[in-house]
Amino acid sequence: MSMSGFMVDLPECVRRVEGVSGLPALEVLGPRSSGVVQLHGGQVTSFVPRGGRELLWLSPLAQAGPSTAIRGGVPVCLPWFGAGRDGGLSPSHGLARRARWRLHSVREEGEAVIVSLVVTPEAVAQLDGAEHWPLGLFATLEITFGDALGLRLVVRNEGSDPLTFEAALHTYLAVDDVRTVRVEGLTGASMLDQASGERSRVEGDLTFDGEVDVVVTAPKQPITVVQGRTEGRTPIYRIERENLPDAVVWNPAEQKTASLADVPDDAWPRFVCVEAATIKDDAVTLTPGQDTALGATYAPLAD
């Protein structure tokens, strides 16, 4: 099977399907979980553990294209986050989530299915903002479909000069109602409110009584997402991070959702973004020939 110039043999549990906006995608039907990976953005848009329910939220209005990132799933923010450390870069959250990634390999390890994708400077060359992509930056994303969803991003500097980048796994987690969700494991960490610019320490669990858009620096491991604040309190997701020291927590609430064309007005209670990141002061610099591995595991805790 040829996909974006790569000859890849697919196991029986993986097949090519039509993805968002009719673009190529892979459907994984593994022993422990199933899901979908879009080549646009190298983006996981579905993960369902065996006998469980969907982990990820995907907007029913999601679109994909050279100027459009898919709303939902796990967008890969690279090589900058937001407008970048200096606030002047565009498009928001970098070019990786708008690029056509190439399939490198699919393999089975025990009861896990692992999909590997790559993105190169050539893949972004025709995109708006391509001049801001470091010429030596190459990245591989390894997606593991097991009992948990594993993502491992390896960034390499194949150029002749040092390069600096930010990265985030902008995961949209599906929830019953964000207004009854708590995010645990952040207490005591430094927090930047991106809306107000105020810095503070996290006191207690994060809850959602309006728009939340915060960057939490170096929270403890793990982070747990809990549905229900008092009676019926149920831990639903556990998040472990590798070389991603920061956490970004976001929900637009009703007012901000009105300005998001690809999010239905009534959809905001159904997701919360808990992102594993290395951004702002934690941006990574690679010398020529150097690489680094960044990762996160999202484990479902309840059916």
Question: Where does each model-flagged region fall?
Answer:
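Active-site/ligand-binding surface loops and adjacent short beta/alpha elements
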Residues: 162-164, 168-247
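Short coil/turn motifs at secondary-structure junctions
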Residues: 122-124, 158-160, 176, 301-303
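Asparagine-centered strand-capping/turn motif at beta-strand->loop junctions
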Residues: 37, 153-159, 300
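Extended, loop-rich substrate-binding clefts of extracytoplasmic carbohydrate-active enzymes
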Residues: 90-146
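Hydrophobic core residues within well-ordered beta-strands of beta-rich domains
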Residues: 139, 149-151, 292
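Active-site pocket scaffolds in enzymes
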Residues: 57-59, 77, 235-302
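Beta-strand-rich N-terminal accessory domains
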Residues: 1-71, 222, 226-243, 288-303
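Beta-strand/loop-rich accessory regions of lumenal/periplasmic or secreted enzymes
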Residues: 68-94, 184-193
